[in-house]
Every structure is written in structure tokens, then in C-alpha cells.
Amino acid sequence: MQIYPLRLLPNKIDFDFMNFKKVSYTFSIILSLISFIWIGIYKFNFGIDFAGGIVIEVRLDQAPDLPKMRGVLGKLGIGEVVLQNFGSERDLSIRFGSSSEENLMKNIELIKGFLQSNFPYKFEYRKVDFVGPQVGRQLIEAGAMAMLFSFLAIMVYIWVRFEWYFGLGILIALVHDVILALGFMSMTKLDFNLSTIAAVLTIIGYSVNDSVVIYDRIRENLRKYHKKNITEIINLSINETLSRTILTVITTLLANLALILFGGEAIRSFSVLVFFGIIAGTYSSIFISAPILTMFVNRKFNKKVIER
């Protein structure tokens, strides 16, 4: 019994991706500029993690219906309300924004009264904290450092595995993906919170994985085809890995679509941003990180890459 791999494309596909190199560069630069301008004008919709707010810790006499509670509290008109279990399923953390410390007590009493009148649970309020914007600034700095260190680690890895200009190609693609992801967040008013920082790091990982697969095939083809120039090698390598790329993006998008549809409001920002990032990362690995090698690589420099 033979098992045949699933193929969405014929074995011998020969699409000239490199012919669209200038078009893709121009398109990416325009999108990046639009993202920068949009972010500069409209900023981000910072969530409680970064903007500050109120945290109420409460214990209930039974496990609460979180989706129903989120829906009811969303009607209060006080902005984003985040409900999460911690410890046991009866322990609940309620977080919501507060424009100032003056209306702190007003919003707390509003939440307590709303919960008491809409749910049959017994509420034991254990702690109420006010999280100021200073904490949010520290979290933003920590998130930025996490992305910076991930960029540096990826650069070192690609440099060791391939060569420095391969790392530079991936770095340019990653910066492109992050800029587009941040622009998308600003345009769609997704909550900018800790989960979206995790989403950006997920996008970085996905984009690197896609690019490394193509780079690996480029290195193999440099060994096999000594008479082809670098443009032909890159085109061949992208075409040979295209079926794998399409299958990967379809399966990951379908899995992420399930999170968007059924994951609930708590992970909505994460799942929507990752969905967009998968598309952006696939585009950049094919039309940016691979074609950009033609600016640095030619036959006389390929010996180091082939030997690794």
C-alpha cells in the first residue's frame, strides 16, 4: 500500500515570482508607509493591560457562566471588561478601564450592583486594585524588548545556519510583517494588550519558519545547479516549496478561524491578529525575504552557503 502526499499544485510548476520583485517591493513600501501614517494619526486602542484600570478579585459559591457574564457586563458602557478565572473555577478576576481615580468607586459599585442583580451567585469580594498607566508603560517597554531580543536571536540563528545576508533578508521581512500587523491593529481598533504582544511574537515565528524552508531549498539547489544564476535558483526554490507553503497556510488559517469563531472575546484580539499575520508572513517569505537575496548573493559568494 502506497501513501501519496497531498498536492494542491502540479509537480512541475514554473511561476516567475522574481518577475514581480519590483512590484512587491513597491507594494510593501506603500503598505508600510500607510501603516506608519495611520498609527501616527489614530494611535492604538490600548487595553487595560497598558492603559490601566481596575482589578476586582471575587470568589463565587459556584462556577460562573463566563460567556454570559461577559455579555451582560459588556452592556454597562464602561468600555472593555475582562473576566478570567484564576486559582479555581470559582475564583474570578474582573478587569475594566477607568478614565480617572475620581470615578473609581462609582464604577466599582456599578459593577457590584450589576452582578448582584443579574446573576444568582453569592459574591465574596476579596481584593480591589487600581492599576495605573505607569504599569502599562512598563509593560509596553517589556513587550518592545521581547520583540527586539527575538529579532536578534533570529538574526544570530540564520547567520550561523546560512550567512549574514540571509539573516538580513529575514530581518527585513519580519520588520515588514510587524509594521503591517501594528497598522492592522490601529485600523481595526483591536485591543492592544498582552495577548496582542504574544500574537506579534507568534507572527514572527511563523514568518521565520516559512522563510527558512525556502532558504533551505535555495541552499540545496545551489549545490545541484551550478550553471543557474541566483535569480533562477530562487525562482525554482520558491516553486518547489509552494505546495508545502499553501498547505501550511491553509491549515493554520483554518485552525485560527476556529479560534476567531469559537474562542470568545477573551482571545479575539490575539486570534484576529494572528490570522492577518499568517497571510502577511506568507506573502513576505515569498515576495520579500527570498527575492531580496539577489541584492547580496552571487555565484562567487555561494561557497560558504553551500558548505553549511
Curated annotation (Swiss-Prot):
Compartments in which it is found: Cell inner membrane
Annotated S-S bridges: none
Highest taxon listed in the record's lineage: Bacteria
GO cellular component: plasma membrane
GO BP, one annotated term: protein transport by the Sec complex
Primary location recorded for the protein, binned into one broad class: membrane
Keywords, comma-separated and alphabetical: Cell inner membrane, Cell membrane, Membrane, Protein transport, Translocation, Transmembrane, Transmembrane helix, Transport
Coiled coil: none
Annotated membrane topology: Multi-pass membrane protein
Signal is among the record's keywords: no
Pfam families: Sec_GG (PF07549), SecD_SecF_C (PF02355)
TM helices/strands, residue ranges: 28-48, 140-160, 164-184, 194-214, 246-266, 272-292
PROSITE patterns recorded: SSD
One term of GO molecular function: protein-transporting ATPase activity
Alphabetical list of HAMAP family matching this protein: SecF_B
Biological role stated in the UniProt entry: Part of the Sec protein translocase complex. Interacts with the SecYEG preprotein conducting channel. SecDF uses the proton motive force (PMF) to complete protein translocation after the ATP-dependent function of SecA.
Family: Belongs to the SecD/SecF family. SecF subfamily.
Assembly, per entry: Forms a complex with SecD. Part of the essential Sec protein translocation apparatus which comprises SecA, SecYEG and auxiliary proteins SecDF-YajC and YidC.
The name this protein goes by in its record: Protein translocase subunit SecF
